[in-house]
Amino acid sequence: MARLQQHFREKLAPELMAKFGYTSPMQVPRLTKITLNMGVSEAVADKKVMDHAVSDLGKIAGQKPVVTMSKKAIAGFKIRENQAIGCMVTLRGVQMFEFLDRFVTVALPRVRDFRGISGRAFDGRGNYNIGVKEQIIFPEIEYDKVDALRGLNISITTTAKTDEECKALLTGFRFPFKN
């Protein structure tokens, strides 16, 4: 069992139950999935760029990413239908908790000029989105072998009904929010 998963079961769930006055343990908000998405617009011109992006995202997530294809042609962006434009990974279960642990304890402190993550990136339904500007903050990526700096979006999906419940859950997982 992952360290954060054990922390959730033993300490965090009872704390949230007391804080929000839940009557059943099934009402306690929990993590459903974490989705990592990397848009690779340079892949339109050079196909090898997509291979590097898939490799980087695979190292970060610990599982093989799915290449996302364009749904329709957009002439302004020089994109054809069914052309590779990005890659994504959905993490659940133990891998999700392991990634979250590495992200909060190792990757976030390596961000330059880091002062905490925004408390305004909630979507109103109990989910949270974080944009990472450089993939090199993750220890799995070797700086010397990186061909280009790419960002990625991290979407954390929870069963929380409100943003307040989601923020309490993520704060319990030691997310460093500003203020």
Curated annotation (Swiss-Prot):
Gene Ontology cellular component terms for the protein in this record: ribonucleoprotein complex; ribosome
Gene3D superfamilies, per database record: 3.30.1440.10
Keywords: Ribonucleoprotein, Ribosomal protein, RNA-binding, rRNA-binding, tRNA-binding
Pfam families registered for this protein in UniProt: Ribosomal_L5, Ribosomal_L5_C
GO molecular function: rRNA binding; structural constituent of ribosome; tRNA binding
Disulfide cross-links: none
GO BP annotations, alphabetical order: translation
SUPFAM superfamilies tied to this protein: RL5-like
Domain of life: Bacteria
InterPro entries: Ribosomal_uL5, Ribosomal_uL5_bac-type, Ribosomal_uL5_C, Ribosomal_uL5_CS, Ribosomal_uL5_dom_sf, Ribosomal_uL5_N
Family: Belongs to the universal ribosomal protein uL5 family.
Role description: This is one of the proteins that bind and probably mediate the attachment of the 5S RNA into the large ribosomal subunit, where it forms part of the central protuberance. In the 70S ribosome it contacts protein S13 of the 30S subunit (bridge B1b), connecting the 2 subunits; this bridge is implicated in subunit movement. Contacts the P site tRNA; the 5S rRNA and some of its associated proteins might help stabilize positioning of ribosome-bound tRNAs.
UniProt xrefs under NCBIfam families: PRK00010.1
Quaternary structure, from the entry: Part of the 50S ribosomal subunit; part of the 5S rRNA/L5/L18/L25 subcomplex. Contacts the 5S rRNA and the P site tRNA. Forms a bridge to the 30S subunit in the 70S ribosome.
Protein name per the record: Large ribosomal subunit protein uL5
Native species: Albidiferax ferrireducens (strain ATCC BAA-621 / DSM 15236 / T118)
Gene name linked to the record: rplE
